Amino acid sequence: MVFDSFDIKSLIRPVIDFPKPGVIFRDITPLFQSPKALRLVMDSFAHRYVEADFTHIGAMDARGFLIGSVLAYQLNKPLVLFRKQGKLPADVLAEGYATEYGEAFLEVHADSLCEGDSVVMFDDLIATGGTLIAAANLIRRMGARVHEAAAIIDLPELGGSQRLEDMGIPTFCLTQFALTDK
């Protein structure tokens, strides 16, 4: 498969000073507005995981849902949703974490995974790693393991990918940006 990181990067819109001054937000919605780019992103992930040994797709609220749901369908895997606090209706497990903007809680239905399950976690971007680390902790609390954490974008200067690697969780991203890239 041919993958061009430049094409992907050119369709990720930088939004300066959002959600707060000094932050450059990486907006992936232009990728989803281009059928060719969307197919390239999803096919790249599907190609990586089609023969991998894992049982579930884990998708992070909210943009990770866009990736995870398509891949769960393509790869015929159960989808586990990791939601912001108060969004799930049944019994949940919760995990607190720090974000680049403050503190939050991540929740998952307590019956989503069983001992021995293996999860590929998806989000749109890895910044500090807070969301994915919280999800990994929830996965492990249910007796399952993390196969890999994946995202479209890595912001390596914020250290999230390294934090995940330090926990024994491999990471995979389609592209990366320096914090000052516009």
Curated annotation (Swiss-Prot):
Q: Does the keyword Ribosomal protein apply?
A: no
Question: What would you give as a GO molecular function for this chain, any one?
Answer: adenine phosphoribosyltransferase activity
Question: Which EC number applies?
Answer: 2.4.2.7
The UniProt keyword set, sorted, is:
Cytoplasm, Glycosyltransferase, Purine salvage, Transferase
Q: Which GO terms describe its cellular component?
A: cytoplasm
Reaction(s) catalysed by this chain, per the record, are: AMP + diphosphate = 5-phospho-alpha-D-ribose 1-diphosphate + adenine
- Whether Transferase counts among this entry's keywords is yes
Q: Where is it located? A: Cytoplasm
Query: What InterPro entries does the entry give?
Result: Ade_phspho_trans, PRibTrfase_dom, PRTase-like, UPRTase/APRTase
Q: Which PROSITE patterns match?
A: PUR_PYR_PR_TRANSFER (PS00103)
Q: A GO term (biological process) for this protein?
A: adenine salvage
The biological pathway it contributes to is: Purine metabolism; AMP biosynthesis via salvage pathway; AMP from adenine: step 1/1
Record's function text: Catalyzes a salvage reaction resulting in the formation of AMP, that is energically less costly than de novo synthesis.
**Similarity remark:** Belongs to the purine/pyrimidine phosphoribosyltransferase family.
**Quaternary assembly:** Homodimer.
Write down what this protein is called.
Adenine phosphoribosyltransferase
Q: Which organism is it from?
A: Pseudomonas fluorescens (strain Pf0-1)
Q: Which gene encodes it?
A: apt
